[in-house]
């Protein structure tokens, strides 16, 4: 992640005019959940297009197998141990750890330290308008997006999951409810587009679109559920869908129709934003970055996806838990279809 941010900070220096920056972060998305990375079940044409339009990094890793430490690293460019956030915020750590392990996990920080300079603060001081939408989960009141360099915050607060689910009403103190049934990823994309469309400033923008998707609870619309139910049935249901790996069963196949619908909904939201950039003629001067915070949930929680051939998934320090997609489109710098 530190190397990625080094590239990230250097890119604006390569152009006479400061480019806009759109950073898209998925939640609990395993690298094998994407069509362009080999999934034959999930459909992600808009995310695939980002990978194909720019540079695809083939050895991308997150700094942790769970969300809060990884997100803190993305914001700061520092490793979790240096920041003091080494587990998801809210997890029992230190003397609160109730298992019979001989070694206790370290005490975990509850917020991103105020003394740390974030990427949003650095860009804001460099003349950028800054915007955040979606999942935060690296601090509550006094340590939210607004306290770390973001001028606008739509939906980011202490919670690591969408308290009201993926359809309005959202029960989110930082996001006004839309019409009943409005899909959360689509709403976050629309909020991002509204920010991008603002005409009252000549400043470049830094928009951080941080989806709650595809974190649990796994939910989708009836139409998308039916689409992926038929797809799973047509492909033939696997006889051996789970295998034990140490203490937990691990999902072996990608055939969950609810998760398939969630993936498509998030991908459609990505498409709303990237197509909006093109509509406004901003795609030629906007750096687009896509990644995820940790691996897919193949064991525990909803057992929603499979990370094979990578071992493990979210919460485990094997490849499935930390291997990530990293895609960057930087007009005039990256070449379409290139890899590194």
Regions found by a protein language model. Give the residues of each.
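Positively charged n-region of N-terminal signal peptides that target proteins for export
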Residues: 1-4
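Hydrophobic h-region of N-terminal signal peptides that target proteins for export
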Residues: 6-16
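Active-site-proximal cap/lid insertion segments
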Residues: 26-42, 49, 58, 62, ...
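Anion (oxyanion) recognition and catalysis
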Residues: 51, 124
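His/Cys-centered metal/cofactor-coordination and adjacent catalytic loops
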Residues: 81-119, 171
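Short, well-structured beta-strand/strand-turn elements
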Residues: 127-138
């Amino acid at each position: 992640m530190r190397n990625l941010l080094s590239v990230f900070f250097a890119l604006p220096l390569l152009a006479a005019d400061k480019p806009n920056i759109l950073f898209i972060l998925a939640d609990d998305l395993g690298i094998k959940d994407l069509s362009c990375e080999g999934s034959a079940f999930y459909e992600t044409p808009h995310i695939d297009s980002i990978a194909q339009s720019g540079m695809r990094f083939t050895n991308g890793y997150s700094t942790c197998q769970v969300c809060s430490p990884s997100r803190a690293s993305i914001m700061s460019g520092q490793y979790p141990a240096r920041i003091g956030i080494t587990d998801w915020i809210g997890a029992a750590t230190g003397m609160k750890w109730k298992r019979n392990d001989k070694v206790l996990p370290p005490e975990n920080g509850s917020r991103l330290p105020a003394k740390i300079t974030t990427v949003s603060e650095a860009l804001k001081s460099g003349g950028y308008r800054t915007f955040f939408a979606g999942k935060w989960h690296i601090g509550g009141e006094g340590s939210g997006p607004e306290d770390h360099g973001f001028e606008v915050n739509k939906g980011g607060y202490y919670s690591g999951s969408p308290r009201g689910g993926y359809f309005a009403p959202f029960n989110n103190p930082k996001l006004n409810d839309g019409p009943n049934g409005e899909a959360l990823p689509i709403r976050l994309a629309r909020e991002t587009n509204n920010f991008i469309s603002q005409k009252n400033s000549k400043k470049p923008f830094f928009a951080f679109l941080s989806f709650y998707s595809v974190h649990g609870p796994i939910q989708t619309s009836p139409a998308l559920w039916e689409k992926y139910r038929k797809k799973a049935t047509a492909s033939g249901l696997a006889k051996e869908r789970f295998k034990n790996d140490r203490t937990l069963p691990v999902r072996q196949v990608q055939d969950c129709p609810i998760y398939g619908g969630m993936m498509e909904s998030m991908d459609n939201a990505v498409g709303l934003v990237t197509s909006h950039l093109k509509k406004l003629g901003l795609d030629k001067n906007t750096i687009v970055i896509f990644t995820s915070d940790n691996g897919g949930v193949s064991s525990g929680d909803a057992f929603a996806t499979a990370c094979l051939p990578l071992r493990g998934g979210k919460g485990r320090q094997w490849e499935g838990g930390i291997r990530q997609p990293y895609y960057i489109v930087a007009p005039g710098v990256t070449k379409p279809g290139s890899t590194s």
